[in-house]
């Protein structure tokens, strides 16, 4: 009897919560992440300690959040930290640096290959262009792109942005 082999399916670990009306595509590693309704994470993405709102589109090959290394120590190697590490060796047991929460608002579009540093907040309605490296918070309804990512323009005029923020359509019932 042949067994069905699932190749490259997503790995969803830790305290992750994926809304029943959300999708995570194959090859993605989702760690301690909350994914809101009608949002999707594309193929081969990585998230760690991330909160993602509703109606978000995250393209393939994105990296959002993740662990930090303590650069003020003699070594940045995890063998000098407490807890499990990929090297399975310990020379010291300093506490691990906290992983700050990365927040992606509602109705955010993140292009392919984007990397977002831990602890960043991306406001609702924002767009991040393909291949961007995000090291600063992005306000609502702004378009950013580049390495490092920089402001390109607002998506709408001030009145439209205010209207969309007030309606909070992402909280409406289906």
Q: What do the PLM-derived regions correspond to, one by one?
A:
Residues 3-8, 15-19, 23-120, 147:
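Flexible, glycine/small-residue-enriched loop-and-beta-strand segment within the central core
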Residues 147-156, 161:
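Short, charge-rich, low-complexity interaction segments located
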């Amino acid at each position: 009897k042949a067994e069905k082999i699932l190749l490259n399916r997503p790995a969803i670990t830790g305290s992750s919560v994926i809304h029943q009306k959300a999708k995570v595509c194959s090859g993605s590693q989702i760690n301690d992440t909350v994914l809101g309704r009608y949002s999707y994470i594309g193929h081969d993405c990585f998230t760690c300690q991330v909160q993602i709102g509703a109606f978000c589109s995250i393209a393939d090959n994105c990296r959002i959040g993740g662990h930090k290394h303590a650069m003020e120590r003699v070594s940045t190697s995890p063998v000098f930290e407490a807890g499990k590490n990929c090297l399975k060796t310990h020379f010291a047991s300093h506490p691990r640096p906290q992983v700050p929460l990365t927040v992606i608002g509602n109705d955010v579009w993140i292009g392919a290959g984007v990397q977002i540093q831990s602890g960043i907040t991306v406001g609702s309605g924002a767009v991040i262009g393909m291949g961007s490296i995000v090291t600063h918070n992005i306000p609502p309804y702004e378009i950013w792109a580049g390495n490092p990512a920089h402001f390109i323009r607002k998506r709408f005029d001030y009145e439209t942005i205010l209207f969309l923020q007030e309606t909070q359509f992402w909280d409406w019932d289906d």
